[in-house]
């Protein structure tokens, strides 16, 4: 028996040494099947999510896999009419949402968090094929963190009456997010907004809209009151339409400094509350004497 154990150990060590020499990567355990099936179920085309329903896809543009440059799906370009419809839906949803107690609202946030955990493998693959980041980053960091944000703010929602006495919700929040952390950035913005009793209109980056649309479907599955969360896809023109809506009480924007300056000019004197997170970068400095394999990891 001891001899057999030694043989197995030496074989494994030989494999490990060979692996370090080659530095090849095995295929990730996560496959694309479930994510692609979800896209296929929508016939490869997506409308906006307004008032608890997906609209008919129109004014379509392609979303591309940055790894192989192949088309993943077609997304709708949001128009001024779409934004106005989402404002109407958010206004209606706001009344229903604020009629609930903070504790009742927290139960929806907990449900969202649990659903993200349940669907984390599919969401991770969807984010990786659309954003281009490694599956390890989306699976082990971004998506679990997104779920944790909803858990965290669900807890705060339960304590609103005790810890935030005399505070009141802002109202309708317009939120614009970039492509680098699609679902995590969504969680950063949506979770605290709805926990505090607001309704939301979210515009994801045009390059990475699929996880936001998947999130919208989660909201529908858990029975979140219609209009509390709305997702309108499109480019900067769509975002501009949103910023100019008088009924939107707060704009939260993450993106370039140039666009942030324009938003500040547009909203100046309007009474809108404004949160700007501008010009963020994720630099990685590698010198010529670095271990390149470790740097890639």
Per-region residue spans from a language model:
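Terminal low-complexity tails and localization/encapsulation signals of metabolic enzymes
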Residues: 1-74, 107, 111, 144, ...
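Short beta->alpha connector loops at strand-helix junctions that form conserved
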Residues: 198, 203-205, 233, 254, ...
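Conserved small-residue-rich beta-alpha loop and adjacent elements
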Residues: 155-226
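A structured beta-alpha segment of the ubiquitous adenosine-cofactor-binding alpha/beta core
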Residues: 230-249
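Glycine-rich loop-to-alpha-helix module at the N-terminal edge of alpha/beta enzyme cores
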Residues: 69-160
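Periplasmic-binding protein-like
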Residues: 191, 250-254
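Residue-level signal for inorganic ion chemistry
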Residues: 52, 69-70, 105, 127, ...
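ALDH superfamily catalytic-core signature
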Residues: 258-297
């Amino acid at each position: 028996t001891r001899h057999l154990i030694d043989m197995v150990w030496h074989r494994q060590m030989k494999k490990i040494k060979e692996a370090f020499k080659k530095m090849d990567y095995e295929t990730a355990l996560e496959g694309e099947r479930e994510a692609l099936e979800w896209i296929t179920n929508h016939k490869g085309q997506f409308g906006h999510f307004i008032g608890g329903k997906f609209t008919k896809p129109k004014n379509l543009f392609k979303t591309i896999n940055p790894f192989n440059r192949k088309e993943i799906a077609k997304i709708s370009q949001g128009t001024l009419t779409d934004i106005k419809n989402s404002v109407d839906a958010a206004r209606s949803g706001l009344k229903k949402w604020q009629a609930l107690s903070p504790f009742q609202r927290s139960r929806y946030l907990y449900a969202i968090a649990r659903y993200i955990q349940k669907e984390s493998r599919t969401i991770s693959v969807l984010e990786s094929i659309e954003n281009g980041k490694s599956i390890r980053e989306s699976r082990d960091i971004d998506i679990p963190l997104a779920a944790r944000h909803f858990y965290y703010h669900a807890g705060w929602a339960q304590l609103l009456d005790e810890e935030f006495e005399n505070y009141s919700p802002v109202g309708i929040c317009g939120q614009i997010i970039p492509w680098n952390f699609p679902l995590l950035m969504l969680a950063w913005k949506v979770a605290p907004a709805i926990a505090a009793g607001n309704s939301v209109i979210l515009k994801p980056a045009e390059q990475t809209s699929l996880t936001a649309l998947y999130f919208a479907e989660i909201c529908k599955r858990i029975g979140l009151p219609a209009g509390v969360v709305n997702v309108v896809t499109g480019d900067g023109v769509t975002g501009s339409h949103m910023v100019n809506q008088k009924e939107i009480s707060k704009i939260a924007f993450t993106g370039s400094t140039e666009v942030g300056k324009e938003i500040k000019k547009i909203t100046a004197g309007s009474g809108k509350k404004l949160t700007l997170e501008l010009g963020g970068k994720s630099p990685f400095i590698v010198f010529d004497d670095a271990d390149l394999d470790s740097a890639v990891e």
